[in-house]
Design a protein with these regions (language model features):
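N-terminal hydrophobic/helix-forming segments and targeting peptides
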Residues: 1-462
Length: 462
């Protein structure tokens, strides 16, 4: 069952739309490098389209109404109310907006031999050696005890300083090079170099000051953000690769960017949601946090946030009813939108070609994920697979079915099984990615476009 290369069949109008979607996507990648930034960006975009915050709704909701709810600034759910009763179920697109990164600890700032560092703890599954000697940026928030929230974004503008995690020079790395890849760079060595210039006497340096470089860094932070060192205790600072999303390849057919797992699915789901109107079944797009560490916590998919919001919607459309909430969830159908591993000829030994996802061949569906004997997976029903195929065929969407890699080589999971716990039909679907979980990941522009088309077709035809 060879799948067609989508590039070969596009019309001139489709190529024009493809470029527009991918340009829009790159802007979103640049603006949304953390889960908080993604939520702020999403709220800005959906409010332009008439979406209202659910907490501000006092009257009942009717078909055509658009609402959204935010959880702690890190997850968001948006709904376009359909003509059918909510208890008949929804068509749901679900993706995650957190990505592997390095987080700053709560007591991070220290000096060692006239060099200032931020102590860190990595987040998600990373190859630690990939994060050294790269230009890095600092994003996040500092929250003071009076409730003031100060946004931080250093390293993205052309005239901003950047930061780095250093590595041992090759001339002295004999022992280091003998280590396994997992141990070449240890987690405790991923500390961020942020300064080397001591505070000067004219700037308030005490004669007996031992950590003059640290003091200078703290002075700069105080000048810019009005913060004290204690404010690190209530800060969330994330270290991400500095720089914009770029076209990749002489033919500009690909995108190289940070965080495409899973923002390529999140943003294409968002675009699809914004571009549908007048639906029969209520459409929903939910973008969540914490997937990379197990979907735990208040902002992860395991929380009751989504269920609580659906209960609010039922109350505002059909009147309060726990039974109708349960029916609305069980009768829903979902695409768990998460990325797949693209077949990489450089590492062909990791893939089984008949069950691999290929660049340029469209939206990828995974009947199941998990590891080895399908452990921990959501295994979608054949009847639902057929329904999804019909929806894709209805609008001539290019798509392919794949597994992550060879059976016993490893595995992975998504939010699919969590939503399936409600009894709804769920299948994983997303975009094939090269160098997944690396600081810079690669996607095909054709696949980005087909994901947008596929998600839109799902909302309209299921």
């Amino acid at each position: 069952m060879e799948r067609r290369n989508a590039w070969k069949i596009y019309t001139a109008d489709q190529l024009k739309e493809l470029d527009q979607i991918n340009s829009r996507y790159k802007v979103c990648l640049d603006e949304g490098k953390t889960e908080r930034e993604c939520v702020r960006l999403t709220v800005k975009e959906i409010e332009k389209k008439g979406y209202r915050n659910l907490k501000d709704i006092k009257d009942s909701l009717k078909a055509g109404d658009k609402v959204y709810a935010v959880c702690m600034g890190k997850s968001i759910a948006m709904f376009l109310i359909g003509k059918e009763p909510l208890e008949n179920g929804m068509n749901i697109l679900g993706a995650h907006i957190d990505s592997p990164r390095i987080d700053v600890k709560q007591n991070p700032l220290y000096e060692n031999e006239d060099l200032a560092y931020l102590d860190t703890h990595y987040y998600g599954g990373i190859k630690k050696y990939q994060w050294v000697t790269l230009p890095l940026a600092l994003h996040g928030v500092i929250v003071k005890t009076d409730g003031t929230v100060q946004k931080v974004n250093i390293g993205e503008k052309e005239d901003d300083p950047v930061f780095v995690v250093t590595d041992l020079l090759i001339h002295l790395a004999g022992k280091q090079m003998e280590k396994k890849a997992s141990a070449v760079i240890e987690g405790e060595k991923l500390d961020l170099l942020i300064g080397s210039r001591p505070l000067e006497k004219e700037e308030g340096l005490d004669e007996d000051e031992k950590d003059a470089v640290k003091a200078n860094v703290m002075k700069i932070l105080t000048d810019y953000y009005n913060m004290e060192e204690e404010d690190f205790l209530s800060a969330e600072l994330e270290i991400v690769p500095a720089g914009k999303a770029r076209d990749c390849g002489l033919d500009r057919s690909m995108i190289l960017a940070y965080g495409q797992d899973d923002r390529v699915c999140a943003f294409t789901s968002l675009f699809a949601m914004l571009d549908v109107e007048d639906v029969e079944r209520t459409s929903c797009c939910i973008l969540v946090d914490k997937e990379e560490i197990g979907s735990v916590g208040a902002t992860g998919m395991h929380s009751r946030f989504f269920e609580n919001v659906v209960a609010e919607l039922v109350a505002l459309t059909e009147g309060e009813s726990d039974l109708k909430v349960r029916r609305a969830l069980q009768n829903s159908k979902m695409l768990s939108s998460d990325v797949s591993a693209a077949y990489d000829p450089m590492y062909a030994e990791a893939f089984e070609k008949r069950s691999a996802a290929f660049f340029g061949r469209g939206l990828v569906f995974n009947k199941f994920t998990g590891a080895r004997g399908k452990s921990g997976s959501n295994d979608a029903n054949a009847e639902y697979l057929a329904e999804v195929r019909r929806a894709m065929n209805a609008e001539d969407v290019s798509y392919q079915f794949a597994e992550l890699g060879k059976v016993d080589l490893g595995g992975g999971g998504t939010i699919a099984y969590i939503m399936a716990n409600y009894g709804m039909e769920v299948i994983d679907s997303g975009v094939a990615v090269l160098s997944m979980h690396a600081p810079w990941e690669v996607t095909s522009k054709a696949d980005v476009y087909e994901a947008y088309r596929g998600y839109k077709s799902f909302l309209r035809n299921i």
